[in-house]
Design a protein with these regions (language model features):
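C-terminal catalytic histidine-bearing segment of alpha/beta-hydrolase fold enzymes
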Residues: 2-6, 41-50, 56, 313-320, ...
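N-terminal cap/lid segment of alpha/beta-hydrolase-fold proteins
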Residues: 20-39, 79-139
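Alpha/beta-hydrolase active-site loop
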Residues: 188-208
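Short beta-strand/loop motif that positions the catalytic acidic residue
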Residues: 296-297, 302-305
Length: 363
């Protein structure tokens, strides 16, 4: 497979750094890569039409080139280095800087290697999930792995962060449901939490004509998604109807919102997401802070890399003690690894995570 990074006219970036970043990301994925620069919007249009996928297109600032976003082949992944509003109907990532080019490349490759069905669970463009079903279902309906991405609840980060895990889980025999949700910086905190629950409830409809085992649902959330996973599991456990979570997995999760707000975690990400401090937004903290929701009565696996932020290591250790003290069934898996090792299918910590998940779900 050869991936093309197509650079639009006027893009503000060092060409050599674009080339080396592309080469590094492609090597990680075992694909070849190249960077092609278009001198005009017309040339970019022609190259898009003629270039075999996967393609990551960086449109740059010119209006004529930006007008191509979403108007060219549907498989193109568009990436803006700068923060830009989403373009409806396009596969469009934005705002992660040059470092984020690697994520756009990963997304383009995973979309081709492990195609998913994108299914809306609501009317907003951010209310969807990518569903992947395992190829072999000889033993009956598949357990369901629901994935919740992180990114400190900010809109520049999306469900593409969990593509690799979604593909890996499907290879392991799980149906993977990689959820996108409205983020609070654009829609408010309540929209975020409502979407996560709605995405889980949507599994009932999906299971009507698909082989999904709703008695074996595992919710895996990374970073900020770890908090969302634990809240959703606790919320559904208290409902009289709807799916129940058999196992909640926090992957380097943000598990103490009040203390995280006091420590200015993520440059103030907690207060920005919840709309204030525990003093000014008490309901939201009471409903959403994992420390405040104990006991959840949901089996929980905490996974944390020791080379991650010390504040996350600290919060996970304290949560494990508090959850056990409250009577919850909780396991704390702490091993070498950084913040992204826990969502890397090749890492030891992920292999051990799946050993624990399989055992809990009887696989």
């Amino acid at each position: 497979m050869r991936l093309t990074v197509l650079v639009g006219p006027g893009l503000v970036a060092d060409a050599a750094l674009l080339a080396s970043s592309t080469a590094a990301a492609c090597a990680e994925l075992d694909v070849t890569g190249r960077v092609v620069t278009a001198g005009s919007a017309g040339e970019m249009r022609s190259l898009l039409a003629a270039t075999e996928q996967p393609v990551v297109a960086l449109p740059g600032p010119t209006p004529a080139a930006r007008a191509l976003i979403g108007a060219q082949p549907s498989g193109v992944v568009w990436y803006d280095l700068t923060v830009e509003p989403p373009v409806p109907g396009a596969v469009h990532l934005a705002g992660r800087g040059l470092w984020g080019l690697a994520w756009a490349i990963r997304h383009a490759v995973h979309r081709l290697r492990a195609p998913a069905g994108r299914i809306a669970y609501g009317p907003d463009p951010d209310q969807w999930g990518d569903l992947r079903l395992p190829s072999a279902l000889d033993t009956g309906p598949a357990p369901v792995a629901v994935l919740l991405h992180g990114g400190f609840w900010r809109s520049i980060w999306g469900a593409d962060l969990m593509d690799a895990l979604a593909a890996d889980l499907t290879r392991r025999g799980y149906a993977s449901w990689n959820l996108e949700y409205r983020r609070p910086d654009r829609h408010g905190w309540d929209a975020t939490t409502q979407d996560v629950e709605a995405g889980l409830v949507a599994l009932r409809e999906l299971a009507r004509d698909r082989p999904l085992d709703l008695d074996r649902i595992v919710v895996l959330g990374h970073s900020a998604g770890g908090q969302l996973a634990l809240r959703a599991a606790a919320d559904l456990a208290g409902r009289t109807s709807g799916p129940r979570v058999a196992l909640a997995v926090s992957l380097a999760g943000v598990l103490d919102l009040a203390e995280g707000e006091r420590r200015y975690l993520g440059d103030g990400a907690v207060a920005a997401a919840l709309g204030g401090s525990p003093a000014t937004a008490p309901r939201r903290y009471a409903e959403s802070d994992p420390m405040r929701r104990l006991p959840t009565r949901v089996p929980t696996l905490l996974v944390q890399g020791t080379e991650d932020s010390l504040d996350l290591v600290d919060a996970n250790r304290r949560y494990a003690v508090a959850a056990a003290g409250a009577g919850d069934d909780v396991r704390h898996l702490e091993q070498p690894g950084d913040h992204f090792a826990v969502i890397d299918p090749a890492s030891v910590i992920w292999q051990d995570t799946m050993t624990a998940v399989d055992a809990r779900l009887g696989r």
